């Protein structure tokens, strides 16, 4: 296979991996945790995965602590948890 063909194959595999949704079986366990604002008193908007609706939702994060179901952007939440 030529180097151009290998690059095309690599590009297609990368695209497939990015666009393939995470199945609930393969979803990280932290995606099922409830939103946890943490002990600090800041007011930062963050996103958490809501398994019942299969959507990422916004919540107010205190700025420290909490759990791993906490993402700076909706896009990062969806990539990690949406199936």
Swiss-Prot record:
Keyword Iron part of the UniProt annotation: no
Annotated localization: Secreted
PROSITE patterns in alphabetical order: BPTI_KUNITZ_1 (PS00280), BPTI_KUNITZ_2 (PS50279)
GO molecular function (one): serine-type endopeptidase inhibitor activity
UniProt tissue specificity: Expressed by the venom gland.
SMART domains: KU (SM00131)
Signal peptide: 1-24
One Pfam short name: Kunitz_BPTI
Protein keywords: Disulfide bond, Protease inhibitor, Secreted, Serine protease inhibitor, Signal, Toxin
Cysteine pairs bridged by disulfides in the record: 31-81, 40-64, 56-77
Signal keyword on record: yes
Something else known: Negative results: does not inhibit vasopressin V2 receptor (V2R/AVPR2).
Family from the record: Belongs to the venom Kunitz-type family.
Annotated function: Snake venom serine protease inhibitor.
Name listed for the protein in its UniProt record: Kunitz-type serine protease inhibitor isoform 5
Taxonomic classification: Eukaryota, Metazoa, Chordata, Craniata, Vertebrata
């Amino acid at each position: 296979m030529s180097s151009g063909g290998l690059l095309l194959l690599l590009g297609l595999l990368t695209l497939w991996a990015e666009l393939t949704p995470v199945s609930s079986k393969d979803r990280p366990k932290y995606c099922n945790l409830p939103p946890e604002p943490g002990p600090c008193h800041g007011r930062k908007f963050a996103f958490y995965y809501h398994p019942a609706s299969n959507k990422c939702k916004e919540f107010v994060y205190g700025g420290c602590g909490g759990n791993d179901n906490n993402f700076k952007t909706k896009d990062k939440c969806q990539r990690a948890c949406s199936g």
